[in-house]
Amino acid sequence: MATASRKKKKVKVTPEGTVHIKASFNNVMVTITDTLGNTVSWSSAGKNGFKGSKKNTPYASQVTSEAAAKEAYDLGMRYVDVLIKGPGSGRDAAIRALQGVGLEVRSIRDITPLPHNGCRPPKRRRV
């Protein structure tokens, strides 16, 4: 017996929120939350069709950021604070894409965790 497909609830969100951008060496993830921290929309490079080494390019970061921002903009979000984490290559492209969609960026903070001489880093690549 087939069950009826459920429609997603379209809930209006507050016009303010936070964009969390995690740009690692291998991937880019963008999560947009409201002021309470509830997820409004999210996107990643893999979700947008990028595979392998193409996931860590600035273009993949731009497409990923646009996808998450459009969804949040359609739900009523207008002003965002940006939190960036990680050393990835697409950090700047992601912020420019947010502004291109129409979200007004109020502040940008870098929250990349830095060790106070903790674990030994991976060995250097010899190419």
Swiss-Prot record:
Protein name: Small ribosomal subunit protein uS11
Gene3D superfamilies per UniProt: Ribosomal protein S11
PANTHER family in alphabetical order: 40S RIBOSOMAL PROTEIN S14/30S RIBOSOMAL PROTEIN S11
Gene that this polypeptide is encoded by: rpsK
InterPro entries on file: Ribosomal_uS11 (IPR001971), Ribosomal_uS11_bac-type (IPR019981), Ribosomal_uS11_CS (IPR018102), Ribosomal_uS11_sf (IPR036967)
Domain of life of the source: Bacteria
Keyword Metal-binding: no
Family: Belongs to the universal ribosomal protein uS11 family.
Function comment: Located on the platform of the 30S subunit, it bridges several disparate RNA helices of the 16S rRNA. Forms part of the Shine-Dalgarno cleft in the 70S ribosome.
GO molecular function, one term: structural constituent of ribosome
One of the record's GO cellular component terms: ribonucleoprotein complex
Disulfide topology: none
GO BP terms: translation
Assembly description: Part of the 30S ribosomal subunit. Interacts with proteins S7 and S18. Binds to IF-3.
Stored NCBIfam families: PRK05309.1 (NF003698), uS11_bact (TIGR03632)
Keyword hit for Mitochondrion: no
Keywords from the UniProt entry: Ribonucleoprotein, Ribosomal protein, RNA-binding, rRNA-binding
SUPFAM superfamilies in alphabetical order: Translational machinery components
